[in-house]
Amino acid sequence: MSWIIFYTIIAALLILDLGIIHKKNKVISFKGSILLSLFYFIISCLFGIYVYHNMGLDHAREYYTCFLIEKAMALDNIFIISIIFQFFNIPSTYQHRVLFFGIIGVIIFKAIIIYGGIMLIHKFSWLLYILAVILIATGIKTFNVSHKTYDIQNSYIYKSIIKNLNITHDLEGQKFVIKRNNKLYFSTLFVSLILIETIDLVFAIDSIAAIFAITNDVYIIYTSNIFAILGLRSLFFCLSEIVERFSYIKYSLALILIFIGFKIFIHHYIEIPAYISLTVTISSLLFGIIASILEKI
């Protein structure tokens, strides 16, 4: 029943998004983007209350912790999506269509990765320690890297697409596939979608690795991930412009990843409660936000 409720909510949100809010392909305003993201955030928080009533306080804490971690880790993802759109000169009126179908892909791929990951961890528990090393290494690396970049032209996926598919840079509305002279061509909207899906998969490995350390409950992991991504994609049209202003968020994320990594290593000796994980996550993110704001004053 819980899965039916979740998928019903997601289906309703997607229908609302594509069928009503973006039906006329108008560029959403900055204010509209903020309000829409706030709406998604409220829905996500209300779902957390549903988790609390049906699964208990600890599961609710795990849900909110996973939700916040996924939100934070997806910020770089949003920045790279912006780079992809700029590289292909995708008009703002068509960007939402790419993001929408990207969400559909995320819903499918995240399910596969999460279910597969849980099965592997249940069978090979030592894999958690490998994930812990990856998380700590990623956290340390995040402290040392000034900015993430994405070289589209030299990426393997881009080169493979250009080599194996007929690509046209002339758009015909929102079409991903265009037929000309009895020949099929793929538009840059399609290429953008494939690159974005690839980036989503790469980022999913880090984020899900972090979340596996919080809980191994498939329902909590999957629902928190999907709600977090839905909210961020709706905020894309303003977030892509302001994400760089919050320069200290990456340090918050680094602290969270290192904390989670060490949590895995010591869990046989010290069991860290869900409320501590949630407190560390919220405190770290607040530190990053406040420090970023103070730097601009």
Swiss-Prot record:
Which residues span the membrane? 1-21, 32-52, 72-92, 98-118, 120-140, 194-214, 218-238, 253-273, 274-294
Q: Which GO terms describe its cellular component?
A: plasma membrane
Q: How does it sit in the membrane?
A: Multi-pass membrane protein
Tell me the compartments it is located in. Cell membrane
UniProt keywords (A-Z) are:
Cell membrane, Membrane, Transmembrane, Transmembrane helix
A Pfam family this chain is assigned to = TerC
Q: Which family does it belong to?
A: Belongs to the TerC family.
Name of protein: Uncharacterized membrane protein RP786
Q: Which organism is it from?
A: Rickettsia prowazekii (strain Madrid E)
